[in-house]
Amino acid sequence: VHLSGGEKSAVTNLWGKVNINELGGEALGRLLVVYPWTQRFFEAFGDLSSAGAVMGNPKVKAHGAKVLTSFGDALKNLDDLKGTFAKLSELHCDKLHVDPENFNRLGNVLIVVLARHFSKDFSPEVQAAWQKLVSGVAHALGHKYH
């Protein structure tokens, strides 16, 4: 993904404020609530029977933190997202059989979470930069499918 200097600054400045544990759990939790069919990949996480159960589930929170840690890896490797996510792409494609559109959904949910937590900093320009990034990450994660 190609981000201009200003876009890189916008993304990294906001990322520096992110609490990975808190926002990761919220992003993954929202994905599971808003798109309930994605829960089938997380049956081992226990109770996902309601929005409250999902959002309070410690396994959802822990896995969400792992997901956002991977987004942090993307920020360090903007010039090689496909390489950065090659193993995760293979895992999600070959073993988990995740619909690659779910990567786009997660990216869009992450943008909602960021806008909610950092509304003063989340200008249209910042949103556009983040949209570019999450689209690039989703494409890299879906690479094994192509």
From Swiss-Prot:
GO terms for cellular component: haptoglobin-hemoglobin complex; hemoglobin complex. GO terms for biological process: cellular oxidant detoxification; hydrogen peroxide catabolic process. CDD domains: Hb-beta-like. The keyword Iron applies. Keywords: Acetylation, Heme, Iron, Metal-binding, Oxygen transport, Phosphoprotein, S-nitrosylation, Transport. Residues 2-146 form the Globin domain. The modification Phosphothreonine is found at residue 12. InterPro entries: Globin (IPR000971), Globin-like_sf (IPR009050), Globin/Proto (IPR012292), Hemoglobin_b (IPR002337), Hemoglobin_oxygen_transport (IPR050056). Red blood cells. The modification S-nitrosocysteine is found at residue 93. Heme b binds at residues 63, 92. The modification N6-acetyllysine is found at residues 59, 82, 144. Gene3D superfamilies: Globins (1.10.490.10). Disulfide bonds: none annotated. One of its GO terms (molecular function) is oxygen binding. The modification N-acetylvaline is found at residue 1. Belongs to the globin family. Heterotetramer of two alpha chains and two beta chains. Involved in oxygen transport from the lung to the various peripheral tissues. This is Hemoglobin subunit beta. It comes from Ornithorhynchus anatinus (Duckbill platypus).
